[in-house]
Amino acid sequence: MSLLCVRVKRAKFQGSPDKFNTYVTLKVQNVKSTTVAVRGDQPSWEQDFMFEISRLDLGLSVEVWNKGLIWDTMVGTVWIALKTIRQSDEEGPGEWSTLEAETLMKDDEICGTRNPTPHKILLDTRFELPFDIPEEEARYWTYKWEQINALGADNEYSSQEESQRKPLPTAAAQCSFEDPDSAVDDRDSDYRSETSNSFPPPYHTASQPNASVHQFPVPVRSPQQLLLQGSSRDSCNDSMQSYDLDYPERRAISPTSSSRYGSSCNVSQGSSQLSELDQYHEQDDDHRETDSIHSCHSSHSLSRDGQAGFGEQEKPLEVTGQAEKEAACEPKEMKEDATTHPPPDLVLQKDHFLGPQESFPEENASSPFTQARAHWIRAVTKVRLQLQEIPDDGDPSLPQWLPEGPAGGLYGIDSMPDLRRKKPLPLVSDLSLVQSRKAGITSAMATRTSLKDEELKSHVYKKTLQALIYPISCTTPHNFEVWTATTPTYCYECEGLLWGIARQGMRCSECGVKCHEKCQDLLNADCLQRAAEKSCKHGAEDRTQNIIMAMKDRMKIRERNKPEIFEVIRDVFTVNKAAHVQQMKTVKQSVLDGTSKWSAKITITVVCAQGLQAKDKTGSSDPYVTVQVSKTKKRTKTIFGNLNPVWEEKFHFECHNSSDRIKVRVWDEDDDIKSRVKQRLKRESDDFLGQTIIEVRTLSGEMDVWYNLEKRTDKSAVSGAIRLQISVEIKGEEKVAPYHVQYTCLHENLFHYLTDIQGSGGVRIPEARGDDAWKVYFDETAQEIVDEFAMRYGIESIYQAMTHFACLSSKYMCPGVPAVMSTLLANINAYYAHTTASTNVSASDRFAASNFGKERFVKLLDQLHNSLRIDLSTYRNNFPAGSPERLQDLKSTVDLLTSITFFRMKVQELQSPPRASQVVKDCVKACLNSTYEYIFNNCHDLYSRQYQLKQELPPEEQGPSIRNLDFWPKLITLIVSIIEEDKNSYTPVLNQFPQELNVGKVSAEVMWHLFAQDMKYALEEHEKDHLCKSADYMNLHFKVKWLHNEYVRDLPVLQGQVPEYPAWFEQFVLQWLDENEDVSLEFLRGALERDKKDGFQQTSEHALFSCSVVDVFTQLNQSFEIIRKLECPDPSILAHYMRRFAKTIGKVLMQYADILSKDFPAYCTKEKLPCILMNNVQQLRVQLEKMFEAMGGKELDLEAADSLKELQVKLNTVLDELSMVFGNSFQVRIDECVRQMADILGQVRGTGNASPDARASAAQDADSVLRPLMDFLDGNLTLFATVCEKTVLKRVLKELWRVVMNTMERMIVLPPLTDQTGTQLIFTAAKELSHLSKLKDHMVREETRNLTPKQCAVLDLALDTIKQYFHAGGNGLKKTFLEKSPDLQSLRYALSLYTQTTDTLIKTFVRSQTTQGSGVDDPVGEVSIQVDLFTHPGTGEHKVTVKVVAANDLKWQTAGMFRPFVEVTMVGPHQSDKKRKFTTKSKSNNWAPKYNETFHFLLGNEEGPESYELQICVKDYCFAREDRVLGLAVMPLRDVTAKGSCACWCPLGRKIHMDETGLTILRILSQRSNDEVAREFVKLKSESRSTEEGS
């Protein structure tokens, strides 16, 4: 769909001027339009028409018709083929065409004309280019149209020539955006006016009614764009609007070969570098590697970047008017051939990147790359190429702001970065180019044709002089007096009868006009002029002369007092002095002539009315209209029951008085009896619905005007408006424009003069106060001019306001203008939207009745809205943060946007216009997108400029790299500058929507979103190679974290979400932790070596541990502090870090403990050193607990917590082991002390009675006995209490207590319980009584071991003393521990056994040893036994009968005769006088002998059977030598007691098993060598299987 613009200018006819009253009709594609009718042989229409064209094979038919009384006749016609019409966005001078008499038809369609006539018509026809299309592109398309037209009927097209020419972006690409998810693709679709919505750009192949020419999507970066960023670019900045449009897919619209560049235009105003995005799209595979990019910021351009230049073979069309001025701003490079080749390295990079199997996707396919990945393609490719050529020379150096430190993976990490500048500097000062912007809407928006229409300007100049030389504001008021009529007289104003007998009304004493008292204020005509007119008509020459002289004097005074007014008028219309003087004379004379020589023909068409009052009971009215001019009155027909009637009735009047008024009144016709009676009594029987009084002097030319209906009196109920088409032919002024057009011409020219000529493009804002300050448009002189003109010719104040608003729209970016425009539009809104109780006309209908033109104003607002949106999309550039004035303009611009939204909602009554807050938010986001793109692409330069760095880097190293991370901190710094500027400068200004828009937060959100995409992909690339040091990654992590926490974390849109940035760095943090573990272990070894060299000195007098512990945990805490300061918000990732760090802690501490444990025995001979080393281990445990709490304590990850708890247990075990080793190191010295104690104890004599003397003596003896031990303990325990940590001290005390107790038991009371050698000697030596002497020798002076009761009492007292000593009044071991100590209990039990009889000990043995028989596990045979237990009922004595039945499966090897027999022994108390042992006969060489022998044991009645047991022993009888034991079994009689008898197979074990109690009893009994029962018992329980022969 294309837009055809036709301007019907003038015509020249042959013939008498009186016979022509012509109009022109235009026909194309079944659409017909008609001009107004104009008289004369050289009529001038100057009317514009627009048509939507979908078929270019048709033509435009132009017919000129002459109006007749009955029918119209055709003067001539002309047919113009649409293919021949030029393409242009500028109006041309037009072409004269000869009118022909006949038309030629073909297939029912006009195809040409014939038979020329002498008449000619001037037409300007053109196809309009898309709004704001770049000038170069306009030339290109115009050239293409001309080229196509030049081909003629053959319609051939040279594809070869086309392929050689540089293609331009498609126009469709500028007017639409195909992304269905775009946040901005429908910004204008729901509120565009009918006019703007019906003219789609001519380059679309299909109609796109919603395609807004000012849409600007968020930029989309593609890999193709980024590959081309290294190619040559020419950029040219110009002044007008531009947008940023990217195209993810190709648009198949261009008539050339497929366009390879999308229109990548800036959201920026012309001068912004912020949005100078190097984004290009390749769409032609043949040209991918050879074409270069030219980006041009062109006037009226939707596209700043990506515009390919023309080749020299394409001559641009002639540029006229505004285009010439702007073309002059273009650099010379624009005119050179832009077809260049990219550098070889770019081609190489592209080839390398694509690889043999890689290629870009099809043009219409979606890109496989994310936005962030695209940034990296070029950087990664370059570095990989360089890595292939240049060997890696080590890790890159840290950025200057990163301190290099020891322990590579640990130090040099800045965990608390603050990237904000100490002195904020607006980044826009660095990002903006020199501003050369021409403020205002593009020429297509605010075309002011009145500036070029000299004929109209000349007429307006005269009318302005006429209005100002004798202004209405200075007219002479009437001199009214109360007057009595003697004859029936009618009011001059309302034509009503002056009722009454006397004093009926008012009469002016000067001019004689009569009216009602209520009507005198409605008579505002000048009294002098009225008097002059009347005198002239009645021949009162003298009186007339006097009046004329008075008027002359007044005009002279006016000219003398206000010369500046007429000078301004002369300057505005550029009239030379001589002509001005002559014109002043002419104007004065016309004023003096008044209406005496004035006449006009007036044609009034009553078209329709809207919103009338309902007067009938039915809620409706039956309106008709009366029109009165002078004394002539006419009326329309009645429209019944309609409040929005349409009459379409035309009336003709002749008027000879310029001061006359046209009185248009609307009535409600009543046809009932009441109205008929009223007709008889009153002139006005019908109900009054409203009136409008039109001054004839305010009429000019053809007017189509809506007039608001007004009241006659305060009692009138009036509403609505009436539409009148008025045609006025004033004698001598037949061809002038309507006064509204004339006022527009005056206002626009005055505005142009004051701003562009006097103000050099700046708008002077008048100072005005009060409620009507918005009606003051200029300074005093200029304001008086427009006000007087408006007053004279009836221009409504709202029309003045809308006209001034339209003028300001072309300068809306000048300082102070947005505020004025906002106020103006707010008052315009109030005028239309704020209805009163007296009117029921909707705001939309009132606006539709505007004389300014509904479509015109709506289109103006639509275009202004788009332009404002564009400028807000580059607010950082257009409204610098460093300029308070521009910031105020920014605030006013948003207010203006809000007013436009209010207008659309309340005045246009659109259903859902875009909310101003959302529009501003979208604009802010668009600006931030382009800002980020720019700082990303120019990061090094901007950073160097902002921080005055002199570092020069080659272009390929300025961007992101996989060999270093220098780029990213710089980018973060720039991002922070942007966010800070938005937060501190723009947020306080853009505060109109506090609930919906916070610029600082939006800035942080957008910047973080874009940065996150790039950062994520960058780190994915780094993961592949890990070319940077882990400390560098950690530093970057901290900066990213700081950026997130400072600006992003609290954003509402991210509340409740787990940030994703920790996941980007997880692998690098784990890598750092791996390296840190190695560093920590190395550090540990070094710390221990240093500590060892220093002799493990205490760190201070109060600290009981050495430096190595402090060093180790200082290093671990530093490492953990880095992890902690990461403040990882992702619990799962933090858990990974904690698990890994827990492993490091475990390795380090366990290696420390292992090293100490290994060397510890060597240090035990020194006094303090072992204690310090144990203190070190204990301090490890203390610090580990603190670190556990620091890492989260109960909140710590379960796996990490378990690891640390397990480590704590291990360290506890280590400390126990070291304490044991340390305690055992005192064994030799304690042995010596205890030996001395034993000697002293052996000298104690006396009985163990309980007399006081005996107790005192025992206490003294105990002190004497303890002296050797106490001397030793005093010296050492005092040292330990000083040197050891409390926990270590207790462990050392426990070990010493253990050693002392065991040694006393072993050396004083019994052989040591754990001395298996001694036990074995007991077993072996007791095998036969003849060897007891060996046992005695081993136990050293057995007589001393057989402690007397006195000695036991002394020893018991000594134990109490030792216990109190180790308790140390609560500073040592706890009493509970000491009392329950198994060592003490064992010793005391042994002592208690010393005083018991042999029978008691044996009974205790039998009752306590329940598991003596262990042959079940490894039996060496079995014996069948039958036991019967009898208890005498009288005496209670027990008799046991034992029958040895047989033996079986005896395991024995012997070289000689094997003669097994069974020995049965009764073990128990009170057996000294009874037979205790029986033996069976031996059986020769029988391993399963049968005995069947019965034995009887008699037990006393002192004890029950549970105190006795049978011990069965199978032996091999040997003659002349000791019998050898095969196996033993024990049968407690307690098992037989319940049943009374038992028969079983008893397995034979190798020896008797007993616990410590049994061994103790055995040892005590072994010392009673004179007791036969004891000696026999020891021998019996000490027996074990003899060694077999041959084994």
From Swiss-Prot:
Record bears the keyword Zinc-finger: yes
GO biological processes: acrosomal vesicle exocytosis; cellular response to glucose stimulus; chemical synaptic transmission; dense core granule priming; neuronal dense core vesicle exocytosis; positive regulation of apoptotic process; positive regulation of inhibitory postsynaptic potential; positive regulation of protein secretion
Domain MHD2: residue ranges: 1263-1405
Cofactor(s) of this protein: Ca(2+)
GO cellular component, one term: presynaptic membrane
Chain intervals with Polar residues compositional bias: 230-242, 254-276
Residue intervals of every Phorbol-ester/DAG-type zinc finger in the record: 477-527
Membrane topology according to the record: Peripheral membrane protein
Coiled-coil segments on the chain, per record: 1172-1202
Oligomeric and partner information: Interacts with RIMS1.
Family indicated by similarity: Belongs to the unc-13 family.
Listed name of the protein: Protein unc-13 homolog B
Organism phylogeny: Eukaryota, Metazoa, Chordata, Craniata, Vertebrata
